[in-house]
Amino acid sequence: MNKKYLRDLMNNDLSPLIKDTGIEFYDVEYSNNNGKNILTFYIEKDDGLISIDDCELINNKISDKLDEIDPISDPYYLEIASVDITTPFTRDKDFKKNLGNVVIVNLYQKLDSKKEFKGILTDFNDTEISLELEKKEIKIERSNISSIKLSLFD
């Protein structure tokens, strides 16, 4: 399933349905777990406290629209999940929030013969990020980042 298509669906078709809730979509993911197709929407609130009632509310608000659009031809389970410390980030506001923190960056293509880096996120712009490694700083093109998330251990 095309990630861009799912993000466009989330941003253009589903976000307006939850606008009045104080809850925002963070990201969307389509996966297969033990033969079960799962469409997961990650949600967040400014205060960071997502309850089971919030998940149920969002599920109820978007289910009918998903049935109408029918974005996935195969049967799937709809899952609404909260963002946590292990959730990869992609938005500028997430990069800004994590400046100065230790992050783990996974790449599509190797850079300096490595596909994973762990370092301090020191800067970012529309096209690249800067990481401070042990003795040097490197720049990584954002288009080459498959995932970036906060490191649980420094």
Curated annotation (Swiss-Prot):
Domain of life the protein comes from: Bacteria
CDD domains: YlxS_C (cd01734)
GO cellular component, one term: cytosol
Annotated GO biological process: ribosomal small subunit assembly; translation
Subcellular location: Cytoplasm
Keywords: Cytoplasm, Ribosome biogenesis
InterPro entries registered for this protein in UniProt: Ribosome_maturation_RimP, RimP_C, RimP_C_sf, RimP_N, RimP_N_sf
Main localization, broad class: cytoplasm
PANTHER family, sorted: RIBOSOME MATURATION FACTOR RIMP
Function text: Required for maturation of 30S ribosomal subunits.
Homology family: Belongs to the RimP family.
HAMAP family: RimP (MF_01077)
Protein name, entry field: Ribosome maturation factor RimP
